[in-house]
Curated annotation (Swiss-Prot):
<dbReference type="GO" id="GO:0006308">
    <property type="term" value="P:DNA catabolic process"/>
</dbReference>
<keyword id="KW-0540">Nuclease</keyword>
<dbReference type="InterPro" id="IPR056171">
    <property type="entry name" value="PolC_DP2_central_dom"/>
</dbReference>
<keyword id="KW-0238">DNA-binding</keyword>
<keyword id="KW-0239">DNA-directed DNA polymerase</keyword>
<dbReference type="GO" id="GO:0006261">
    <property type="term" value="P:DNA-templated DNA replication"/>
</dbReference>
<protein>
    <recommendedName>
        <fullName>DNA polymerase II large subunit</fullName>
        <ecNumber>2.7.7.7</ecNumber>
        <ecNumber>3.1.11.1</ecNumber>
    </recommendedName>
</protein>
<keyword id="KW-0548">Nucleotidyltransferase</keyword>
<dbReference type="GO" id="GO:0003677">
    <property type="term" value="F:DNA binding"/>
</dbReference>
<keyword id="KW-0378">Hydrolase</keyword>
<comment type="similarity">
    <text>Belongs to the archaeal DNA polymerase II family.</text>
</comment>
<comment type="subunit">
    <text>Heterodimer of a large subunit and a small subunit.</text>
</comment>
<feature type="region of interest" description="Disordered">
    <location>
        <begin position="284"/>
        <end position="303"/>
    </location>
</feature>
<keyword id="KW-0269">Exonuclease</keyword>
<keyword id="KW-0511">Multifunctional enzyme</keyword>
<dbReference type="GO" id="GO:0003887">
    <property type="term" value="F:DNA-directed DNA polymerase activity"/>
</dbReference>
<dbReference type="InterPro" id="IPR056172">
    <property type="entry name" value="PolC_DP2_cat_dom"/>
</dbReference>
Amino acid sequence: MAEIVASDEMNEYFNTLEGTLKKEIDIVNDARSRGKDPKPHVEIPLAKDLADRVENLIGVKGVAELIRKLEETMSREEAALALGREVAQGKVGEFDSKSEAIEAAIRVSVAMLTEGVVAAPIEGIDRASIGKNDDGSEYVSIFYAGPIRSAGGTAQALSVLVGDYVRRGVGIDRYKPRKEEVERYIEEIMLYKRVASLQYTPSEEEIRLIVENCPICIDGEPTEAEEVEGHRNLERIDTNRVRGGMALVLAEGLALKAPKIQKHVKNLKIDGWEWLEQLISGVKSSSESDEDEETDGKPKIKPKDKYMRDLIAGRPVFSHPSRPGGFRLRYGRSRNTSFAAAGISPAGMIVMDDFIAPGTQLKVERPGKAAGMAPVDSIEGPTVRLNNGDVIRIDTIDEAYALRSEVEEIIDIGEILINYGDFLENNHPLAPSPYCFEWWIQEYRKAAPDTETNEAELKEPTQEVALDLCKELNIPLHPKFTYLWHDIDNSQYTALADLISKDGLLEADGSFLKLPLQRTIDTGMKKVLEDLLVQHKIQGQALTIEEPLPLIHSLGLDEELSKGWDSLGHEELLENINEIAGFVVRPRAPTRIGARMGRPEKSDKRKMTPAPHALFPIAEAGGNTRSLEKAANFKVNTNSKAGTIPVEIGNRICPACGVEGFEFRCECGEYTLPKLFCPRCGISVNKEKCPKCNSKTTCTSMRKIDFKSIYQKAFESIGERDHLDSFKGVKKMMSKHMTPEPLEKGILRAKHGLFTFKDGTVRYDMSDIPLTHIRPAEIGVSCERMIELGYLKDIYGKPLIDSEQVLCLKVQDLVISYDAADYILRITQYIDDLLVKYYKVAPYYNAKHIDDIVGVLLMGLAPHTSAGVLGRLIGFTTASVGYAHPYFHAAKRRNCDGDEDCVMLLMDGLLNFSRDYLPDKRGGQMDAPLVLTTRLDPSEVDKEAHNIDMCASYPLEFYEATQNIANPKDFEGTMDLVSGRLGTTLQYEEFMFTHDTSNIAAGPLKSAYKTLGTMVEKMDAQLELAKKIRAVDAPDVAERVLTSHFLPDMFGNLRAFSRQRTRCVKCAAKFRRPPLTGSCPKCGGRVILTVHEGAVKKYLQVSIKIAEEYNVSSYTKQRIELIGYDMKSLFENDKSKQMGLSDFM
């Protein structure tokens, strides 16, 4: 394996991590060698690089060495294709048949294309088979499953190209579809679009073109309950149900990613794919939609309202598309943004009623679809009008808390910080930059190269200094005094100039301008001042503006308030201002970005539903709560023995003494084997398939076990008392051989208040936010401890002596929430208990306080992947997020647009994870650490991380080019990107950022969405905020919530009520119709409805109220009225009532 290029300091860091990892593996192997687990060793193989990950994930021996050899001379994609052909030709690995070799070839190629991280190669590809064409030739079919989605569109499409490349190598012909098969594809994809979702839906012509020309048969296993109506029972298609995997690969893979496939086809000179040219000319990727249009010869960014679709009640809209008052784009990267995370002022988070907290996802207009939110207090906050009429900008948290109850209207919600790299990643044209300080300072330096600059002073100059600099250096007006002139028109500008000229009163020293309040309001000029974001105060009957001289000069007035112009000669107001003012005024906020709330941030323990402490099956013996204590005392009837329970469990046999049982180890000390039999023939067979009928064999059956004895022995063996508040198991094991977990582990988990996941590990989920730099003070760790962890110098090379110094975060170090830290602390205590009481070895952590767990090793894992990443805990945050280096998130194949992942204690994974517990179903191996990446190689992480910019400032040419909506690729060579540092020591070190933030956890601790109670309360808060924000149209929000959330919900619940099944409260048996006896025929329990009247009607009254209050369209009102009638007719008692004489009087 080629050595990763890193400095001595970074190599020492990696060696420290790997040394601790080796120590923990040795401890676990020693503990597991005592025979108390399904395997006597650690079950998570280690991988130092992509080649190792692919080999461990797919299980084809010798692949790793071949990958390393191929990557020396080829690109990743070319190497994947070559690798597939080598495997298919039998040069690597051993296979029983040609179809098996082709299947393995496709799997290893897809694994390589997805960095050996995602589960798609093992879960998303069901199998490959060889079929017959009508002319007698053979063709290859690839059967895809739902989890292929996690591979991404490009890898999905490339898997088909791999299949073609491989089948040529082994001499198999192309697929020749029948006419009815082509029509079946068309019907099926259109049906899949209705029942699920597709990022891109190809037209019928495009589907026909792909199926008729694709050399591989794209098949799949059935994933949806819906069946096709026409083109059924086809000979070469096994099912009439919808095949989701096939639809994804054809639509989101081949159709959407055709240009990328064509590039590889041309590079590799593969014939037979010429039809891609025809497909590309007819397909327009959703990511390549028209972003800019010509207006008067100038390019312009068009508003996009896609993010506004499917609005959910309780999750507010912060700005309609590109509307004045919405988020103002500011280019730059803070130490906690980039990689799809954006920064906003923490003061803005508070002023907007706490709906946004660190980690909250926002659906955004551009450059991508969504962004995780991070607090950045070095950018501008919201500008608000208070109840007393004052207009001020709130930039600090203290101000926000003090004034938020007085806010009458949010005129402007502030800036949003988005880095250049996110525009490059999304291939989004560079929207015009606002005129900001980092642009102005470069123009200042260019005009005065010999002048010493004091940035702190120049950031907040006085009005006199700002005007003097304009005149002396001939540079544009400072951003502090540049107002939003592009938000008003020529007539408003003229009226404002006239008002100030006639009625304004300027203090002698020019420090204040006073205007008559009532006249300013009556003429509409107060609103114009608000639109311009001119801050002012109301003092008695006067409106007072501080430091008014730049405003006065921008209006073409002198210091006597005399107007020096009569008319405006240009249509564009800024052109007129630049002519009249005598200095240049640049656009202050040319780009607004619309946004609404997506998912709230998350920091919570991972629980299955319901949450068990132990993976031990007890069927119905534990009742609805799955209580293991209840199961230990369960009686089938009054005469039966307590605790003898019938469960479905795996039968195992000891190869040494022949004793049968269900445990993985026999009393004689030998490990047991599954006792396989054919469920159809009933014969014992020691093979995966029955030789008689070819059915899959199994070892599971219903049997009675003495659970009470197991339960008591478990408590006794670890010296614990049976006094647990709650102790839960599972009804049934989902694993292949249904081998239960030792009950002792569950007892100790319950003791420490922990819950197990499907693989025997304890997890904690957190929203992903990037972090490249830290201050020891903000993560709750002393300088001394940071030095022990290897943080010796700050980003300027100075020795670490102060907890406020900024340090470059090492790539595998994590900062987790305090709540997560408490949970991890309990896990360390559980592991120590387990080592001492169950394995009878020495404790490892001895942690009593969260300070004791700083430096412990963790493992990060994303839900759609099967590869864990080694990490180290170095600090804590009050925010409900998990902060980690972008490389760490990218290694899990995640970005930070609102995704959430889990961390687990490394020792817990090593000690308790077992493949024997994983569910034996599609997707069962996803979200399981089947391999562990020990060292992060930036060249092998998700390529999105390569587009992150690491510079301290953006060049002047960048800001200027954005005014012409430049292509982001034009600056790839200019910007300091990760991609330009790969293969050098700088790929790990000397990162910088353009905007600092004083505290990465500033802002609300939790989103209001999580703290508000009912959905009605959330909805009320959402609409109140909509009324408060100038950039939001509250009636439109109300209409959208009704049509996309409440109405579909009510219709769905009404339909569900009429089709519902009934349920027994005692044994949970379900019935299609209520039993005639009114009680459960199985246990005699009470039978109840599963959908109740309250659930159907819960949104009706609130919908009627919203429709009236916000005057929604008459069509929506009528829909609400009609569904009200439906509910009334369904639930109202139709019995005739006795009427008296008085009823007619």
